[in-house]
Amino acid sequence: VALLGSSADETALKLKGKDATTVILMMGLQGSGKTTASHKLAYRLKKEGRNVLLVACDLVRPAAIEQLCILGEKVGVPVFTIPGEKNPSVVASKAIEKAKRELYDTVIIDTSGRMHLDDALMEEIQNLAKVTNPDEKLFVADAMTGQSAVDIAKEFDEKVGITGVILTKFDSDTRGGAALSL
């Protein structure tokens, strides 16, 4: 299907070689599945031989850091955190420093979301993108969101630029909602 990409080059993640650090920024609304998608992506990349570091930058949702740590431990991928830090850009930049120093070739940054688009969320994501200069900016959307997912994706694309989309919870709705729209 041309909509989904007509070649593997169009749909594959743009990963640098193992001698450099690829940074992947995960973004989307609260509850879209960013944390779970982050750990699943980390697991896949680890199985492909990448040395992955997950970064807990959702400093808004209670227990988000703990959730990512539990999921990371389940798949054998370390999670970078700075207990008590309130600025996700500080956490992300320190994580990338660690990744380069300790030869991680892939960094996946799990970010916070909000129930609805707002200026605070977009500013936080823009700051993270500016500080981390990510190679991939993946928009995570709940497949059941429907047409509003397109409007939300457009906003993220205009403010930050989207390089890819991950649809989550695809198994919970037979209609697929946002799948073809995105």
Could you tell me what each predicted segment is?
Residues 30, 55-60, 82-84, 111-113, ...:
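G-domain G4 guanine-recognition motif of GTPases
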Residues 41-46, 89, 123-126, 159:
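Alpha-helix termini
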Residues 62-65, 117-119:
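Conserved D-loop-proximal element of ABC-family nucleotide-binding domains
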Residues 35, 61-62, 89, 146, ...:
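Short alpha-helix boundary/capping motifs
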Residues 1-57, 64-84, 91-101, 105-111:
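Primarily NTPase-proximal linker/entry elements flanking Walker-type ATP/GTP-binding cores
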Residues 104, 116, 122-130, 134-182:
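Conserved phosphate-handling catalytic cores of large alpha/beta enzymes
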Residues 86-90, 119, 147:
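Conserved phosphate-coordination/catalytic loops
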